[in-house]
């Protein structure tokens, strides 16, 4: 049969595409783009329903992520073994530069993510998500540059990505393992041992290895270890002959299998994974998702953490003589490849699915991965396209080069980082309105620290961070996690932590207390004033519902007191309350025997009739305490108090009246007042009691919930009933 040139041409084009280095990356990009389109089209429900369709014991999504991806990891394992024994990683000099760079590219993104999510254990599980590099995507982008990228850079990127994949496999095996089933795990070890014995006995036929690999996958899947690990273990057991072999050598079992899997994995397995997991529906998705620390942690980890980690580690290794720069590659090109390492699509999404069970967190993960990968791909490609080969002009940061090219590159680097900083800060400010009052925007606190050596000081955003301490509750000793109260013991720690902030010009204290023990009130007041003098900081007090009696005594520690117009303020007096049961014991047939050495030892005994002299003695004590309280008010509010005769009578007023009486300095709320004082860039940092890794603080200030035992709970319940009643009575005096 004769074939016309027209009929032969399409086949030739297809073959050239499949054989090209960029084909795998382009196919994966197309699959991801198609998934996004379908997920936001009229076919979205069909798409998501299909992924949750059960085929046997697993849904389609689980078959893809647990079974199909095991084939991907099998190929990864084969590549790792071949490179370690017969490739670029066969010698230590060749391993040093990509190995050190890969370590930096794993560690720094994880640190950035952990810094942004350290206060949320659920989100912190995803620390490894931004640590991976997608070899297909990255090499695909690099291949689009053609001859502009020297072959040494391609080898460096491929080797680094393989080591990155090895690190990801180890991370998955160690940190993302569910409950272990020892019988299945034991069976998996036995199967792996069989594979090892076959390798040592020089079994070269692939069929026994493949059958054993399927059995190994079954046991690993049921053991609790993620099933994809089975693919890597099986790959490491498939023999590679000691003699060096070419990539297309069909004599070695490893080369045979790698050659057979390369195209199916690149054009079937990975695109299916991308299509199944990149579909994000933007319907009903709030803008706040973009500003969530989970999304930002992944985005910044991939885009900034990868480039700084890889390039910084590589630069350090080269400058210290541990490794050599890739032949023919300039520093600019090496930096461009470091940016490309932030493309973490396949492995990053895969680790994200293992980290987070909830749909919302998985969506935030995918948004972070897609955004970070896209930024890395675009910026890396543009920089590499504009870069020149190894010349002194491309090395302005490390050589005294005054050429115009060197200066232009230096300007580009500064403008690039400055633009990244401004854009990130702007986006965060836009999203701040959607955040709660005291929620910190982690991006705005973390990013200046990362870039402060690159951005001139005069260009940095000026922000003021104010520590906030919440003092809420009745004032008395003996508080527990079940009945939190205010005392010097329970507040000293957070007060010291707040005042220890060297960069804060002031400390804000939020008070909501009806009062209580006068001694504890004065001790807390005194501690605040001592810390303010020691650290030379202003103290601003903000009254919420009530600052009465002892609560107002603590409020006097503020240089300025601000309240809401409806807040309750005042009650400058002293009250004592107790219960009397003089006839109770007789009625229930109980005789109480009391023996004293001192005539006044039974003063105000609740089981004896009240005596007039005892009442007079108590009132004398109250007058002394009241006088001390009045002196404190006059000292702290000197020149501000009005002439109202009821000022020290124990009456209390609304915030509006209290302002006219001089008991407070003004009306308003915390954020508005601090913005007016320190500018719109002010940030509030809530100071909380320290939390353990396993214990969680119950509301208020008290013991860790992890340390509360049933016996303690029972004791606290019995001991606290009357105290709770008394505390409720204190709040009730102010209608609360």
UniProtKB/Swiss-Prot annotation:
Keywords: Antiport, Cell inner membrane, Cell membrane, Ion transport, Membrane, Sodium, Sodium transport, Transmembrane, Transmembrane helix, Transport. Pfam families: Na_H_antiport_1, Peptidase_S49. Na(+)/H(+) antiporter that extrudes sodium in exchange for external protons. GO terms for biological process: proteolysis; regulation of pH. The chain crosses the membrane at residues 23-43, 58-78, 96-116, 126-146, 155-175, 178-198, 201-221, 265-285, 298-318, 334-354, 367-387. It comes from the Bacteria. The gene is nhaA. This is Na(+)/H(+) antiporter NhaA. One of its GO terms (cellular component) is plasma membrane.
